[in-house]
Structures are given as structure tokens and as C-alpha cells.
A protein has these predicted regions:
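Exposed, interaction-prone extracellular/peripheral surfaces
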Residues: 1-31, 44-49, 58, 67-103, ...
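A positional/architectural concept
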Residues: 33-36
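N-terminal juxtadomain amphipathic helix
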Residues: 51-53
């Protein structure tokens, strides 16, 4: 399903279920299998067994083969965090980036509840979390969180912008991270756009990601993008008025005159994100609004299965 074809569809729950079915069709096993796995003990290796779980470091020290055994929790606990900040409301006439993040969270929520895994939903902007639910695995909990996502799906660009009003009480990102349990799964759907003049916000984000990894949490980072405009600056040769969706400041520029400098800056920014994810062991994937969501999610989890 392409977002441009379904953006005006109001029955969000049906959309999420249909996208989930398309996503599952592209996989051969549960996409969340193996997340809550913890090392338990060693046992001697028996000839003829698979060598997959041999502890090679222990072999080098003792010259004996031992198998690493793992305990897998029966129920996964997950946190779905969706960025609803101003930069996600692009393009202004269709808010495709925000809708991709919302639909992605809806699909994953359905998958988790289907497996009887508990999850919480969080919505955040540049000031922190506007909404965070408790962790539950019931059908009623799923329907409640789908309702929250549906409200944002069906909002107009204007009402969506009003959601991030400064008079709403926010929970800080730091506080939310401290409430995440050990070995939980955290899925973040965001464009990862920060004001380049305010480096503290970006540094704080990666500090919190490092804290989650220290707690042995798995992090799946789906970076939502409008590649044609944001990565390529493909806006034609006419003058364009650029509007900051978070501060509403404006500037009029000729795209082809700044394209070279902009693309160099964007490449450097993406390289930095990729490097941070690599260093922290975060599974990172780009999600373009021009691609079907099922294709994006399938590719994301296939990539993960090859890495783990």
C-alpha cells in the first residue's frame, strides 16, 4: 500500500491490519523472535551438533568446545515511540511522514498483540513525550492505542500542528528512558531531524539511546524520510519558500543554488546517524514515504535477521 493512495482513508484500524497481513506474507518466521534472549550457561559440545552456538573465545582459552545456552522469555515487552514533532508534518498538505510513522506503529502493535506480547505506545515531539501508555498485551489495550494513533491519522495538518502546543505537559525523554525495563524492545519511528544550531538536543537523544543499550534493550530505529525533497532537494528551478515546521520561520531560496551545499550537509548528517547506530548496536533503517510500508518493514526485519 502506498501512502499517497491511502492517506485519506479514515478507517485506520483496517489499514493497519491490512498492512500487517502484507508484511507477514513477506516473512518466514516471527519478526520479533530472538529479542528477549539472555545467556544462561555453558554445556559440553556433543559431536554432530551444530557449531552455531559454540563459545569460540572459551575454546581458545581451554581448548575444549562448549555450547552457549540461552533462556528466552515467553513474553516480550516493547515500547513503540512515534515522533509527532513539527518536522514530521511534511508535506504540509498531506503530512505523509507523520502518517508513515503512525501506520508503522499500528502494524507493529497488531503484530505484538497477536503474539500476546505486551507493548506501550509513546508519542513525542521536540519537548518530550505528550503521551505514554502502560505496557499491556490485551486486545482491549491494542484497541485503545489504535484509537490514539487513529486520532492523529485523521487529523488535518493544522490540527496536528496544534497537538504539539507548548501548554501540554510533557514527560522528558530522560524520564521515559529510565522507566524502560531491562531487555525491553524499543521501536522508534522518527525523521531524526534536529535544529543544527542546537546540538544539545541531538546529543541528549544519543545519550538516551546509549542508556537503553546499557540496559540491554534492543532498539529498532525507523528513520522516516521524504527522500525526493529532504535528501535530494529535488524541488525544480523556481524560487521556493522554505518554512520551518517547528518554528514557522521562513526563507525564500533558489534550490539549485544551494543544492550542492545542502546535499553535502545531508550526507554528513546521515553518515553521523549511521555511525552512532553502528557504535551503539542499533538496528537502523530508512523508511521513504514513496515506498509501500509493508516493503519497508519486511526489508527492515530481513536485515535484522541477517545481522543477529
Amino acid at each position: 500500500m502506498l501512502l499517497e493512495e491511502i492517506q485519506s482513508f479514515t478507517h485506520f484500524d483496517l489499514l493497519a491490519q491490512k498492512a500487517k497481513e502484507g508484511f507477514i506474507a513477506g516473512l518466514h518466521k516471527s519478526p520479533f523472535r530472538g529479542f528477549s534472549v539472555e545467556f544462561a550457561e555453558h554445556r559440553p559440545y556433543n559431536p554432530g551438533e551444530s557449531v552455531k552456538n559454540i563459545d569460540w573465545k572459551l575454546l581458545a582459552r581451554t581448548d575444549k568446545k562448549y555450547i552457549k545456552q540461552f533462556d528466552e522469555e515467553t513474553n516480550l515487552k516493547a515500547h513503540l515511540w512515534v515522533d509527532i514533532s513539527g518536522s514530521m508534518r511534511y508535506p504540509q498538505d498531506s503530512i505523509l511522514k507523520l502518517k508513515m510513522g503512525i501506520l508503522g506503529a499500528g502494524v507493529i502493535a497488531h503484530l505484538l498483540q497477536q503474539q500476546k506480547d505486551g507493548f506501550s505506545l509513546g508519542l513525542f515531539d521536540e519537548q518530550g513525550f505528550l503521551y505514554r501508555s502502560s505496557i499491556k498485551s490485551t486486545r482491549g489495550h491494542l484497541q485503545q492505542q489504535i484509537g490514539v494513533l487513529s486520532n492523529h491519522w485523521n487529523q488535518t495538518p493544522k490540527t496536528t500542528a496544534d497537538t504539539a502546543a507548548s501548554n501540554i505537559n510533557h514527560q522528558t525523554f530522560d524520564s521515559a528512558v529510565l522507566q524502560v525495563g531491562r531487555r525491553h524492545l524499543v521501536v522508534i519511528l522518527s525523521d531524526l531531524l534536529w535544529d543544527p544550531t542546537e546540538t544539545a538536543a541531538e546529543a541528549a537523544f544519543w545519550k538516551n539511546m546509549a542508556m537503553l543499550r546499557f540496559q540491554k534493550c534492543e532498539i529498532l530505529l525507523l528513520q522516516v524520510q521524504h527522500a525526493q525533497h529532504e535528501f535530494q532537494l529535488d524541488l525544480g528551478n523556481r524560487p521556493v519558500r522554505f518554512i520551518d515546521l517547528e518554528t514557522q520561520s521562513q526563507i525564500k531560496l533558489q534550490p539549485d543554488e544551494i543544492q550542492e551545499h545542502y546535499l553535502a550537509f545531508e550526507r554528513e548528517r546521515q553518515d553521523k546517524i549511521a555511525q552512532q547506530c553502528l557504535q551503539l548496536g542499533i538496528d537502523h533503517f530508512l523508511s521513504d514515504v514513496s515506498e509501500p510500508l509493508e516493503q519497508t518493514l519486511t526489508a527492515f526485519f530481513v536485515k535484522r535477521s541477517r545481522l543477529h
